[in-house]
A protein has these predicted regions:
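N-terminal export signals
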Residues: 37-59
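Twin-arginine (Tat) signal peptide motif
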Residues: 31-36
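All-alpha RGS (Regulator of G-protein Signaling) helical domain and cognate RGS-like helical scaffolds
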Residues: 2-29, 43-44, 61-392
Length: 392
């Protein structure tokens, strides 16, 4: 259990999402000169040129890597996603999590935190610890890539989005976010997918799983207070907290599928081990948040700025596809319908998994406001991961 330490709210963090050179300061220096040169050049690039520049530098750096290009790509793409994930979890933590020196923080927003605690009284701890986990994921993946002579993922040039200006945010990060939590369109079909014993997206790619919260999949919704005005509308603030509660598992179920999908392409046994060791932690996050989301209070609220309405239904129902009590993954068809049904993560089909994950996040609205250079860079990383093939 984490406790608040107000004396270190704005202090440095041992898991600060800073330049990779700082993270690697304590690592052995052997053969790091060319990689450090690579880092200094890429970090200095402007957002307008970083797409092409980073991609060409990545290809050049791979020449001396002890990893195959495919295995490096299988780690670099999730490293980039983990950087993005850490970025939005840090935003959640600044406003609604525990403020201490373990993760980068703000000073907290009492009204938002209280709205979250209506859903789960340990919400601040959960947000804090999930934030911590995602930071360690991208730091480890990038450090491992560099230790093998491969280029890391680097998104520093794309930290250009505004983010929230509400009380509690880190003022130094306003205008320097990677992700946008204020215009989300959230696909909650995972809720019914994991309760359905007859369908699996790997076998039924055209089957449409019903939404748990249909209005979240329509229009755009904010999961954090955009400014202090948002906290003055009690019912709408509850809707913001509910939106966050469903955004959390929506993100984490994606990681639960991505890691095992990419692992099927790995050649190096250590790369396989990394993917299979990080992936289950995403599933642990998903399981926690999927349980928490069921506690979101039923309500209907209207965004006072956009006029968009959102309705959170009562999920304490007899319908087994929607019943919030049924949190265990229902057995379903897997590999072939000639085999017995089995409880599994789904989907895990490796074909196009990385591009599918990137499309999912883009359609969610998480990158609204990002540059074309950002999308070019992320698309290239995803395509290279999807192109990887097992070498035996």
């Amino acid at each position: 259990m984490k406790t608040a330490d107000n004396g270190t709210v704005n202090g440095s963090s041992k898991h600060e999402t800073g330049p990779l050179e700082d993270i690697l300061e304590k690592k052995p220096r052997k053969s790091f000169i060319s990689r450090r040169s690579f880092l200094s050049k890429t970090i200095a690039l402007g957002a307008g040129t970083v797409g092409a520049g980073l991609l060409s530098n990545i290809r050049a750096a791979e020449t001396g890597s002890s990893l195959s290009a495919g295995d490096a790509a299988l780690l670099r793409f999730p490293a980039a996603l983990e950087i993005l994930e850490a970025d939005f979890w840090i935003q959640y933590n600044e406003l609604g999590g525990i403020q201490d020196d373990e993760v980068p923080g703000g000073s907290g927003n009492e009204a938002y935190a209280e709205a979250l605690e209506v859903i789960e009284d340990e919400m601040g701890d959960y947000i804090h610890d999930n934030t911590d986990d995602e930071i360690t994921h991208h730091q480890f993946l990038n450090a491992y890539l560099v230790s093998k002579g491969a280029a890391p993922a680097n998104l520093d040039a794309f930290r250009t989005l505004m983010g929230s200006t509400a009380t509690g945010v880190n003022q130094n990060k306003i205008g320097h976010r990677l992700t946008n939590l204020t215009r989300l369109q959230i696909d909650t079909s995972w809720w019914t997918r994991y309760r359905d014993d007859s369908h699996n997206p790997d076998l039924d790619p055209n089957f449409v799983f019903p939404q748990a919260v249909p209005t979240l999949a329509q229009n755009r919704h904010t999961a954090i207070p955009r400014d202090d005005a948002d906290t003055t509308h009690p019912l709408f603030l509850k809707a913001i907290a509910n939106t966050a509660a469903f955004h959390f598992p929506t993100i984490e179920q994606g990681g639960s599928s991505l890691y095992p999908a990419l692992a099927q392409k790995a050649t190096d046994v250590e790369v396989l081990r990394i993917l299979m060791s990080i992936g289950p932690t995403e599933t642990m996050h998903f399981q926690t948040w999927s349980d928490v989301a069921g506690n979101a209070p039923p309500l209907t609220a209207i965004d006072p700025k956009t006029g968009v309405s959102v309705t959170f239904p009562d999920l304490e129902v007899e319908n087994e596809l929607l019943d919030k009590a049924l949190i265990m993954p229902e057995p379903c068809p897997f590999l072939s319908r000639s085999l017995p049904i089995v409880s599994v993560i789904r989907p895990t089909n490796p074909q196009g998994a990385a591009m599918g994950a990137l499309r999912f996040l883009r359609n969610m609205g998480l990158f609204i406001g990002q540059s074309q250079a950002f999308f070019a860079y992320m698309t290239q990383l995803a395509q290279e991961a999807d192109a990887a093939t097992r070498g035996f």
